[in-house]
């Protein structure tokens, strides 16, 4: 069943609130119509009958390296996020060809989101993480090229801690996102819930953003390990796939939503995957060998 326009507009207002909290300074978020949000609120409250104009705005992003600015133009169709968002990035430091490539990459990334997922914040993060290469490639066109260097990628492993992971729909989402992004690792359900995700940096960061967005509060990345690699990173992986890890519940409470996972079993699992060192990082206690 398709979502109603009113439901879509409510989600748009929610995302705009998040954007204004992310960019609180005057002029960072510039609405094409300063009354746009007010008109939508009136429409949702029933004091305005006509469908309000679409939300259109520009966000000015400061890219740290190189020191440049990107203006991200955004148009939210009335049925967004259930239909595609309209995005376009501009910068005076990019020529026409590089600007085209930048927007092609951005559009391709946004196309990976499912209908109903808000994605402006993710688009901003993508630009902040990935735009530098487009400016660099423009610079190389005008500068004498030196001996080509192998392209390096960052291989990342994130250790994520949650108070608990019980709900079936959340567990399914975690597995689906992990397999879609071709990362490896595991999700240990129960209390506490532990997730390990490893792969290229951009894939892991997208995984992290997607699973906790929009309202998973009791979750944090406790530890991250990264290394530069010129290969595909396969030799750096500690896991061969992304799977759900089901361990015995301490005290055998069955399916009750208050059971604690058997941390002794979890420690043995970590040892098998050369990750015993993260036990103390995750739980604040030193691991003890079962042989002692």
Swiss-Prot record:
Database matches in SMART domains: RWD
Pfam family, one: Prp3_C
PROSITE patterns xrefs: RWD
Membrane-spanning segments: none
Domain RWD: from-to ranges: 14-134
InterPro entries reported in the protein's UniProt record: Phi-like, Prp3_C, RWD_dom, UBQ-conjugating_enzyme/RWD
Protein name as catalogued: RWD domain-containing protein 2A
Source lineage: Eukaryota, Metazoa, Chordata, Craniata, Vertebrata
